[in-house]
Amino acid sequence: MMRTWMVYVVGLVGELYGSQVEETREMREMKEALERLFSRRLSDSEIEMVESLENGGNFETRVLVPVIFHKDKVVVSPAARYRDIEKEERVYVEEVIRRLRSLVWHSMVYIYVPKNNDWIMDLICKVSGMSSPQRLDDVALYKDTGGNCGMKFVDLVNKMFKQNADMLKKFGDLLSNGAETRILELPDSLSEDERRREVEMLQRVKEYGKMLCTEDKQKEIVEAQKIMCDACEQIWRREEDRKEFTMEIYSRYLNMKVMRGGVERDVEDPLIDHMDHYMLISTHKKYKCMDVVAELVRKVFVEDKDIEDSDVMSAVCSVRERKRLEEMREMEERKRKEEERAKNEEELLRMVEREEREKREESKGRGKKKRGNRGAGESKEESKGRGKRKRGNKGAGESKEEDRGEEGGVEAEDPLEEMAVGEAWRKKKGSGEKRISEEHHYKVHSRVLRWKKDAGEIKRELDEGYEKKWKNRSIEEIKEQKKVHDIVEVMKLLRDKEKCDRFFVRTGKYMKGKSERWKMVANGILEEGGEKKVGKVEVGLFKGEGGESVVYHLMFRPTETERTGRVGGSSFGKYDDVDEIKKEKSSDMFGFRYPSGVRCEMTSNRNEFRIEYRNRKNTSEVLRTLTILRIPET
């Protein structure tokens, strides 16, 4: 949802360059300011978005993401209580909470209205300052256990929304009256067309103000945030969902940091995200299932898009499929336990039978010994008796050996619990070997290896190839694409299971072009010529005919291309823009060496994997740097 992002950026431009811009040159000034901010020219889609905002404003509804981030980790999760926060992070968290009520208020009422933003922002601050809740000690409220375990962070957020709702009517009245006054005060010097546009915009502001005065709108804002908090709490319970969610939060913080020129803020406020209140509430009412709402929130947040009907149905289908698989696993687990119980009972019966047989054999052996001692008077008979006893003892010995052999045979079979564990271990080991094979050994498709070549050769191959979207590209375009696609060194990170799991999140599998596909995604920063771009490192994989995992897509996707929906859309989406994958030659990359001269240098630690690409002719010159960042701690 590029619109969400651009609303923030346009607001940030006002913060960095001053909110008062000469209205006759406002559009050009805004574009120039944004280009200075991005250190590049705006794309056509970005210019279109800025023009749309400048012409139509932004009245979209918003929600607050109930998570506090500090540096590269989550320090307060949705369900966190004050006692759960690490002691060294509490001072930072308390400072965030002191600013939280103001942020909540802005998320409830902020709108972007070109040429009118100054007086609206002044009004937002004025009403917020007039409110009595502003003087409450929110830190003490969060700390207070009240004889129990204390409130969760989502409870604190919801409480602030409810308290701030009392100010909505006052703000709505002032906003509506202010818009009406400005309609009456429009200068006569405006052309008919300019006057019409100004009246239309101010009329929208007036209607918005009146809407805020209604009880229905006030309830909607509070209810939507409550649903958002519950959804985030639900997301946090599933590890894979939590990882994706926090990676997207981290990505947005990185973008803000880069746009500020790397200037660190003392405190980073929780994120505000544009989300359709009506769709959120109606989905919750219709399905009465927080799993569905949580899946919907996760999907639209990590894919950074507006809620559409198709997203709701996708969330419903995902939850149903997940529950079906969980039920299957539960059924298999019950079946396994039943089989284990039956084997235990069988083993117990065998043990009882063995003990009874041993007792009978022992009793029989004692009886033979007594009968052998009765004829001990005569030497001949004694001699015969001794012979008989010897033979009898020999028989007894054989019987005991047989018993020991039988018993030894049973002992050779592990006790049932050990057998079950052993069998499970063997199965686990087998599946583990398969998993290691998938995660450690990849083949790389020729469409990925192509980007190692020079731009001219790449262009020739693409023009002669089967992928229509790559045909007839200019050399300049190919060179730009090479910067984000020629990153095959990432394979070194992928082969190390421990590191790979620390940096990359795996997305769900999907079918396309008769092949099963999935992605691995990590946050990254690409630096070149003093410019930094935040984005995602994407790895696209499919299952080869021999069951091996083949990397068919590898690139760094800058945030601006992801948010404008270009080049395949969101990194986390279950789709890609590769329609067909030809059965071309793949390589496992073992033994690969670049031509003479240093091409790149790789360094890593627990938090980042860094690749520096150097000029082969002058190895001291760094051409570009790709830094892959660890999944944030949660």
UniProtKB/Swiss-Prot annotation:
Q: Which Pfam families match?
A: DUF1609 (PF07753), DUF3654 (PF12376)
Instruction: List, as start-end ranges, the regions of compositional bias called Basic and acidic residues.
Output: 354-365, 397-407
Feature: compositional bias, Acidic residues: 408-417
Region: Disordered, residue numbers? 354-438
Would you say which domain of life the source belongs to? Eukaryota
Looking up InterPro entries in the UniProt record yields: DUF3654 (IPR022115), UPF0329 (IPR011667)
Describe the family membership recorded for this protein in Swiss-Prot or TrEMBL.
Answer: Belongs to the UPF0329 family.
What is the protein name given in its UniProt record?
UPF0329 protein ECU11_2090
Which species?
Encephalitozoon cuniculi (strain GB-M1) (Microsporidian parasite)
